[in-house]
């Protein structure tokens, strides 16, 4: 096994074709990390000109110290049962990490627990410290240890039927409601950033500046690995649909009124049907007024939601999503998710990753809502083998990875106690 010098294109081709490859190991992903102070080095190993393993090493300087952290996000990309290739990758990583004064090499392979026995054993044998099997969104990890994934290598009906029953009904309703899902361009990021700000204010989290999303789009879109989707509501088109539905409801009422006059047996049923239709008419009249007001203010329509869809070979990722507070009954997110899954499948993906989650958290958990949303899309829990550290500077590692977090937790506890007094 020997070190190899390969191009960025060869590196990406290997990552995209390998079962353990991941978006975070693509060379263009490293470009997106520059804004936050990371820089990259890449390594490859193989035999007789054939690549057998690669890794993208991200480095970031430790504040106020002449040291760095080496982070191989979702790497190494290698067959973990191939001890020779794994050992060669570690040797190459150590050589570069030491030159960059890294205190540790941190990895979190895209390898699931039920397939990771070799990986776990072989990494430990090489001297890696395993950080345990904690909850998926544990703050002790950089990347989530658990994600929710939908298999999308099936036709439209099979895909829809893989969703939970209630969610399936919502998707069907969303398709009828009259929104349009657009694959947008870079200009659409302005709208997306505005929707993200609204989402952050509603759900209570800090949002990224538009430059962050532009950075991702610019780096990965050219290779087809980043797409922006937006969902639009056209008031004129939907006013016409509401008028049609109102006409149908009035016709239905007339039909049941006639039955009431001709059949006493059906009188009770007819009255129930009339009441139901009248309730629907009231709701549609309210909706029509809202749409007419929207048409006056925004005759061209408004965007209700958006998302970034990412790719790495046969894997697709729902990376960021945002939505408006208006017209939520139109279920724009449901329309968008189903459309993005189909788009991903049509462009070679077999899986659709919803991102991080815990495993069946309690209802009072801060992560319950996230899990509840992701579980209804025909997903399975992808539990990874977790995070590993290869220590290069033990005193500094202990200070940064162990002592400092304890001090931070202690400060938080003291602060909370003082606030209670």
Curated annotation (Swiss-Prot):
> Which PROSITE patterns has this protein been placed in?
FEMABX (PS51191)
- One GO term of the cellular component aspect? cytoplasm
Localization, UniProt: Cytoplasm
Q: Which domain of life is it from?
A: Bacteria
| Gene3D superfamilies named among the record's database cross-references | 1.20.58.90, 3.40.630.30
Any Pfam family the entry gives: FemAB
> What is an example of a GO molecular function annotated in this UniProt entry?
aminoacyltransferase activity
Biological process terms from the Gene Ontology for this record are: cell wall organization; peptidoglycan biosynthetic process; regulation of cell shape; response to antibiotic
Q: Which reaction does it catalyse?
A: beta-D-GlcNAc-(1->4)-Mur2Ac(oyl-L-Ala-D-isoglutaminyl-L-Lys-D-Ala-D-Ala)-di-trans,octa-cis-undecaprenyl diphosphate + glycyl-tRNA(Gly) = beta-D-GlcNAc-(1->4)-Mur2Ac(oyl-L-Ala-D-isoglutaminyl-L-Lys-(N(6)-Gly)-D-Ala-D-Ala)-di-trans,octa-cis-undecaprenyl diphosphate + tRNA(Gly) + H(+)
UniProt KW keywords: Acyltransferase, Antibiotic resistance, Cell shape, Cell wall biogenesis/degradation, Cytoplasm, Peptidoglycan synthesis, Transferase
Family from the record: Belongs to the FemABX family.
Q: What does this protein do?
A: Catalyzes the incorporation of the first glycine of the pentaglycine interpeptide bridge, which is characteristic of the S.aureus peptidoglycan. This glycine is added to the epsilon-amino group of the L-lysine of the membrane-bound lipid II intermediate (GlcNAc-(beta-1,4)-N-acetylmuramic acid(-L-Ala-D-iGln-L-Lys-D-Ala-D-Ala)-pyrophosphoryl-undecaprenol), using glycyl-tRNA(Gly) as donor, in a ribosome-independent mechanism. Involved in methicillin resistance.
The record's note on quaternary structure and interaction partners says: Monomer.
Q: What is this protein called?
A: Lipid II:glycine glycyltransferase
